[in-house]
Structure formats: structure tokens, C-alpha cells
A protein has these predicted regions:
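Bacterial Sec-dependent signal peptides at the C-terminal "C-region" and cleavage site
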Residues: 1-8
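Charged alpha-helical initiation segments
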Residues: 7, 13-15
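Exposed beta-strand and adjacent loop surfaces of beta-rich binding modules
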Residues: 14, 40-44, 130-132
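Short amphipathic, basic-aromatic surface patches that mediate peripheral association
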Residues: 15-38, 63, 143
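Short, low-complexity, polar/charged sequence segments that are solvent-exposed and flexible
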Residues: 35-41, 77, 153-156
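Structured domain cores in non-transmembrane regions
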Residues: 37, 48-148
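Short beta-strand elements
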Residues: 147-174
Length: 174
């Protein structure tokens, strides 16, 4: 076997975060000539203290962490995971709060964009008794009547243009 399928063992005080694939997990991303590609969501999982201050990132998808978008040109996709981006508070030379290709995100676990549900195991830092787990999930080109592809930059419902997000990201907190 070319892979190692070790079982993950959980100990006292470990935290398991489970994201389950729903019917809209894979989304049609238009390529060209009416051809679509099944596109999984972008995801970030991070911790905040009880006052809402960012502590650390537990997991973020590889594409946003490294800016390795396909067919995005120079669009850094600032609409992809905006709450996570701003929560980190790291402003880059171009004024955006997103990692760059030259300065990728390396502080946490990054992974390929999952095509299925997955689990994340977390061991809270020593002494960290109370915290909030946040999860932000977003799909590219998830347009609707309120967030149309035709919205122009400057419009209140603009979400990145024809390859933007469409609807805003969904954020969960526990």
C-alpha cells in the first residue's frame, strides 16, 4: 500500500470537529463552453477567546492559504473567506488581509480542498479552558437573485465578479 492509514486516537480534552458533506457540498463551477467542474467549498476553522480575539487557525484549505486558485488571474479572491481573513489581522503589502503566493499562510494545518466531509482533531493549548471555535465555509460562483453575477464593483451586493463567491460565506461558532 502506498499510503499510511493510521487511526487517529483521541485523548482526554481533545476536541474533534466534524464537517459532514451535504447535498450541495460540491458545486458546479463554470469553466467554458457550458462545461462545469464540481467545486468543493473553501473552509477555515479557527479559535477565538471569549472576547472574540483571534487565537490561532486550526485548518484552512490550501487554495486560500497559498493563493493557488485556478483561472483566477490576479484576483486574490478577497471575498472567499473574509471573516477568517480579517479575524487574523494580518495585512499584506497590497492592503488585503489574505495570504499571498510569496507569503503563504503557514501558521496552521492546511489541506487540499476536501471533496467529502472530514474530521479535524485539535488539542487545545495548555491552560486554554474557554474558547470559541469558528468555521467559515464559502463556495465560488454561488450566485442568486440577491448576489448576481452581474453585480458591479462598488455595488453593495458585489461578490467578486463572474468568478466571485455569489452568496456570502456561512459562519458557524461554538
Amino acid at each position: 500500500c502506498s499510503c499510511n492509514n493510521d487511526l487517529v486516537e483521541y485523548k482526554k480534552n481533545d476536541l474533534k470537529i466534524t464537517l459532514e458533506k451535504g447535498e450541495s457540498w460540491l458545486h458546479d463551477f463554470p469553466l467554458f463552453l457550458g462545461i462545469n467542474k464540481k467545486n468543493p467549498p473553501q473552509i477555515a476553522i479557527w479559535l477565538e477567546d471569549r472576547d472574540g480575539n483571534y487565537l490561532s487557525t486550526v485548518y484552512v484549505t490550501h487554495k486560500i492559504a497559498t493563493q493557488s486558485w485556478q483561472m483566477a488571474g490576479k484576483n486574490r479572491r478577497k471575498e472567499s473567506l473574509p471573516h477568517w481573513s480579517y479575524s487574523r489581522g494580518v495585512k499584506y503589502d497590497d492592503g488585503l488581509y489574505l495570504p499571498t503566493k510569496k507569503e503563504p499562510f503557514t501558521d496552521g494545518l492546511t489541506g487540499a480542498t476536501p471533496h467529502d466531509g472530514f474530521d479535524v482533531k485539535m488539542q487545545p493549548a495548555e491552560g486554554l479552558k474557554q474558547f470559541r471555535v469558528k468555521i467559515e465555509i464559502n463556495h465560488s460562483t454561488d450566485f442568486n437573485d440577491n448576489y448576481p453575477k452581474s453585480a458591479q464593483e462598488g455595488d453593495k451586493n458585489y461578490s467578486g465578479g463572474k468568478e466571485g463567491s455569489g452568496q456570502p460565506a456561512v459562519i458557524y461558532a461554538a
